[in-house]
Amino acid sequence: MNSNWHNVSRREPCPVCHKPDWCTISNDGAMCVCRRVESDRPARSGVGWIHRLGNGSTAGMGCVLNPSFYNSTIPPFPHSHNFTLLHAAFDGHPDMQEGLAFGLGLDGASFAALDVRYDAAKECMSFPMRNPQGEITGLRYRHLATGRKWSEKGSRDGLFMPREPERTEHLVITEGPTDTAAALSLGLNAVGRSSCLSGVSLIRDLVHARQIRRVTIVADHDRPGMDGAHRLAAALPVLSRILVPPEGIKDMRDWYRQGLTRTQFDEAANAIRWQLPHRLL
């Protein structure tokens, strides 16, 4: 995180979306980068939108920034090899991965597939974010005790996906690393975006590179999740369908923890009609 900004937290949630994770606030309290609510000024990192806070009356609206300040807050982008070395230094023993997954109600094999590791110094899990070629472009952390989420300094947006992905024509797209792990635990060919509105171009490139013909987008059961799923579907040149967990279930991980089986997932997904790409409508 650049020194001019700090991560939101449960004590200081995002003033725009009111969530305790993913977003950042400038240290002077004048601006916020929200990763869920759009403004007319996308963050240069490609992840989130900038909102002028002022006295709180303009949160969620577009803003005009001082260009010199805006440019000065962009952290440098290290080569992906640096992230690879950093991540490799963390504990990736199978027993550790099994324990981390168990603590979240997930299958250890899914954490092994995603190469989830443990950073003892920060007491957090490390989830690598990858570009469509599989190179690590950043690291997402999740604190073991508090669940707080943040990214390694200099990280660029990427996808949560297995090091050795399946070669199938159908792809399941989720939101976040633990939802991706839940989908992988069911034996699905899955990748995850870092948030409900990010990663559209990354998914599009991945679909092209892997020759994917159909995508099932699993949306979080909230307005931002469903809006983001529809925007992603509209941007992809393949057949798509959007699956929302049943009422009372927040997301894919919650659904899996409540006993979802592969048969039940397939039945729920197959009840939804495939939608043609927008360019063919």
Where are these regions (language model features)?
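Phosphate-handling DNA/RNA-contact segment within nucleic-acid enzymes
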Residues: F69, Y118-R214, A229
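TOPRIM metal-binding catalytic domain and adjacent DNA-binding surface shared by DnaG-type primases
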Residues: M1-T24, D28-R35, G46-E135, R156-D157, ...
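Structural alpha-beta junctions
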Residues: A234-L243
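Short, acidic/turn-prone active-site loops that include or flank metal/cofactor-
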Residues: S194-G199, D220-H221, P245-G248
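Short, surface-exposed amphipathic charged segments that create phosphate/polyanion-binding patches used
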Residues: D205-R210, D251-Q264
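Extracytoplasmic/secreted cell-surface and envelope-processing proteins
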Residues: G225-D227
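Acidic glycine-/aspartate-rich tracts in secreted/extracellular proteins
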Residues: E38-D40
